[in-house]
Amino acid sequence: GHGAYQAPDWTADWLHRELTNWLDITANQEFGKNFADLNDEQQTLLKARLTKEYRGSKVENGTVVLSNTRLAAMEKTAQYYISLYGDDPATKVTREHFAMKDNTLPDLQARKDLAKFFFWTAWTASAERPNTHASYTNNWPHEPLINNVPTPENVIWSIASVVFLIAGIGFVV
């Protein structure tokens, strides 16, 4: 985000929006209703497929392989960001909440490129590295829809960094 107090972490925001779009698209294709309107069993089934698709996403011959459903979810998510960073009245209130000016990125191509960048950061945060159960970002940011939780290494190094910081400040003082 830009300051964390005003706007979201864009990677986390994109990832969550794309996941919920995927769930709604799939629910409508298979059950004829939105994900929130499904029963618990149907929701559990779709969440398991969602996790498998996103955590199992990989690169083959230098190309990220994505399903048609994921491509549709990405496009819907991209349209939100193109709107948000433009001057679309539909996202004006959100821009105000995020302390963003209208037409933050006036150039449409720049907005499309930004959306592609946000997708890429979300992909690295959700796809597991080969031969591991951790994403390229060590399962950060946290995203419960796909069981993206910080690895033990994340927790250990976070605690260690705070200890080193306090020790360093104590040494200087």
Where are these regions (language model features)?
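Soluble extramembrane regions of membrane proteins in the secretory/endomembrane system
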Residues: 1-155
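Juxtamembrane interface at the cytosolic side of transmembrane helices
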Residues: 167-173
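N-terminal membrane-entry
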Residues: 151-165
